[in-house]
Amino acid sequence: MAKKKSEEHSGADANDSDYTEEPNFDDPPNFVDNISDEDLLGDMLAQRPSEADGVESVVVVDNMPKVEPSRLEKLKSVINKLFSQCGEIVNVVYPVDEEGKTKGYAFMEYKTASQAEDAVKKLNNHRLDKNYTFAVNLFTDFQKYENIPEKWEPPTVQPFKVQSDLYNFINDPDAYDQYCVAAETAPNCVQVGFWQNTLPEPNELETRERFTDTFVKWSPLGTYVVTFHKPGVAIWGGSSFQKIQKFPHPGTQFVEFSPCENYLVTYGPTPTGQKIIIWDIRTGTEKRSFVGDGMSVLSMFRWSHDDKFVARMGENSIHIYETPSFYLLDLKSIKIPGIRGFSWSPTDNVIAYWVEEQNQIPARVTLMEIPKKRETRNKNLFHVADCKLHWQKSGDYLCVKVDRYSKLKKDKKELDVKFLGMFYNFEIFHMREKEIPVDSVEIRELILAFAWEPIGNKFSIIHGEPNSSNVSFYEVNKGVKPSLVKRLEKKSCTHLFWSPRGQFIVMANLTMGTFEFVDTTNDYIISASPDHFRASEVEWDPTGRYVVTGVSSWKVKEDTGFNMYTFQGRIIRRTILKNFVQFLWRPRPPTLLSEEKQKEIKKNLKKYYPVFEQKDRLRLTRASKELLEKRSQLRETFMEYRNKRIAEWKDQKSRRVMLRGHVDTDNLETDEVDEEVVEFLVKEEITLLE
């Protein structure tokens, strides 16, 4: 065996036998290595240079128009403009027949193979017009398809995987709602807990550490919860919140579900602006992508109530896409010069949009049916500075808040415009009535907030000065002008939160953390006025029975947590949670009962009262029994700990006596103790009396 010797002591040290022996890595004689190079060095061999055919960067475009030589240049211009978006085009060949007419396909060579793959991904099945849809393939795919074996072999049967029930949360016999609570445990590390709002104490369903990097969001029907991560986003669901699907979109900042949960829109930054991707939730495939400019494009896509259409606003136009193809409706945009905003009806395929004033032409609010593109109502408006569109949740009414001016002042270059003498109009469209009549309400004070009653015919506004504002409630009825039914004066509120079931409303000041609970059917009496200092959010549960106010660590760093109240403002519980971030009720899907069945249940509700009261008594009895058992168990645990410590204390008595000078201090009487009082000067003050 080889010996390791120091150069400094070679031949001079007699202790050669103390040198350490090197391990021998030689193979024994006749050794056969059973490990192949691919198994041992697979990752390195995958990177070794290989021969190339030189056609990896070539794509074949089929289903192109067959044109005469006179129209070929125009076709080339259109094709080059479209395909150059995927990379630099080196060469293009358009095969022609004997007469010089193109054959309907072309060969296109990109600078790199990755650009060719990107062209196939983005432009395959691209619809040029109603007659031509491109079929784009890599040139190398032809060789792959030529080598398909003639004998067909059936695919291997994959084992069936039972998917978790995504709707188990609505099967609870007592109809308890669920909610999630998020708290930041470390930078870019958020813990999320899922709870069931049982009585008397909530039941913890699941808690996930490092569940998301920033925050979470429920889907509109409560089926999924989405989490945010550096590579993209993921959706979770089922009884134990398993991962359902993931969507790779690095740096996603915001997501939006379609109303029926068929599609997901992700918004993420790019060097030039925002990239928006529309995904199919069930398959996880990308349906279409867009690149916005540097401006904020959050929620730039608006969905119809049935997921059949999605729309976005362009320059002097609205682009409406059909699903699932995501082609433009009728293959063209709707040209609307001067359009400034639009919104879908929450229950019908109707778009409302407004157009600004132009060249002495008044501003206009228009209702348009989709897909017919038929205008059903127009309303001209004069001296308009801005408009806001507010749909009632039931789709019965549309309110257009119009900011109007008495005088317009422009500078010399007309770059800076000032509006003087501002006042406000509310234009109410009665969507369910014949010819859609419009009523108008004028307010001469500053409007701070507006909110429709979700189920009903009332709306509320905050108007006046911010520090001493008024809250007015209006009622809308058929055939008459909207009437003022109640005005609450000198209220320092900033936001209005209606119950999802209507009738009750919370008037909130999210600056001071004050809240007022109002019953709009009982002479607008304020039932409670609780405080939650620094509260920044208000969340009604889907049934309208509970309200939660929260103090998020995004706003402040101390005293974070949430309070839960009844719909009348009675406090149920207070929860202090360090680094609390977010509280979200889980939405519920719409009921499957018909309106007639719901009316029947409401009519016979008194029959069910005894059953509900009995359940409440049993629940309270069970809760009291569980509480007593818990207290008894805690007492037994404490007594066991106490007896253990007393026995340990008795065993140490001899040691205590020895350490205390052989004096048993355990049994000292009070008369054997000397008490000494010491007084000393603490402070001296001199007060002059006049």
From Swiss-Prot:
BP GO terms, sorted: follicle cell of egg chamber development; formation of cytoplasmic translation initiation complex; regulation of translational initiation
Pfam families hit by this protein: eIF2A, RRM_1
Domain of life: Eukaryota
Record-level Gene Ontology MF annotations: RNA binding; translation initiation factor activity; translation initiation factor binding
SUPFAM superfamilies the record matches: DPP6 N-terminal domain-like, RNA-binding domain, RBD
Start-end of Basic and acidic residues biased regions: 1-11
UniProt protein name: Eukaryotic translation initiation factor 3 subunit B
